[in-house]
């Protein structure tokens, strides 16, 4: 049986918070469907007047769903050896995705880059996963400090 550290609870809470964020974006798409009269299962609007706004709201949610599986994988695995770092990066990703979505919601897709911190956080989370793999394989050892062959310097 594997034993996770008590601090892994932060990772679990971050994962739950990410679901709340994804649900929030989904609710926004549902509201936009009603407002712009886009019925299921149509994914994108062709309405020349309001289609662009609906499509921006839909794309913000869809793009988040596209990166959600890697986010959850990196959070879950990277958090095994680095629960606090992974949780902090996970929160940065969540905030970045909200900034991304609300930038997109303006109707100006270039404003989605306000959420670039989320992409940086995702790459850093990938780093915690790689570091965890190296530690698990015994290629480096956990810990801080110079000369310890750790991920932290």
Swiss-Prot record:
GO terms for cellular component: mitochondrial outer membrane. It comes from the Eukaryota. Residues 1-8, 92-119 are mitochondrial intermembrane. Pathway: Lipid metabolism; leukotriene C4 biosynthesis; Lipid metabolism; arachidonate metabolism. Keywords: Lipid metabolism, Lipoprotein, Lyase, Membrane, Mitochondrion, Mitochondrion outer membrane, Oxidoreductase, Palmitate, Transferase, Transmembrane, Transmembrane helix. Its EC number is 2.5.1.-, 1.11.1.-, 4.4.1.20. Coiled coil: none annotated. GO terms for biological process: arachidonate metabolic process; leukotriene biosynthetic process; prostanoid metabolic process. Disulfide bonds: none annotated. Residues 30-70, 141-153 are cytoplasmic. The chain crosses the membrane at residues 9-29, 71-91, 120-140. GO terms for molecular function: glutathione peroxidase activity; glutathione transferase activity; identical protein binding; leukotriene-C4 synthase activity. Its main location: mitochondrion. It is a multi-pass membrane protein. A lipid is attached at residue 151 (S-palmitoyl cysteine). It is found in: Mitochondrion outer membrane. It catalyses: leukotriene C4 = leukotriene A4 + glutathione; 15-deoxy-Delta(12,14)-prostaglandin J2 + glutathione = 15-deoxy-Delta(12,14)-prostaglandin J2-S-(R)-glutathione; (5S)-hydroperoxy-(6E,8Z,11Z,14Z)-eicosatetraenoate + 2 glutathione = (5S)-hydroxy-(6E,8Z,11Z,14Z)-eicosatetraenoate + glutathione disulfide + H2O. Belongs to the MAPEG family. Displays both glutathione S-transferase and glutathione peroxidase activities toward oxyeicosanoids. Catalyzes the Michael addition reaction of reduced glutathione (GSH) to electrophilic eicosanoids to form GSH adducts, as part of detoxification or metabolic shunt processes. Mediates GSH conjugation to leukotriene A4 to form the sulfidopeptide leukotriene C4. Metabolizes cyclopentenone prostanoids, specifically mediates GSH addition at C9 within the cyclopentenone ring of 15-deoxy-Delta12,14-prostaglandin J2 (15dPGJ2) to form 15dPGJ2-glutathione. L-cysteine cannot substitute for GSH. This is Glutathione S-transferase 3, mitochondrial.
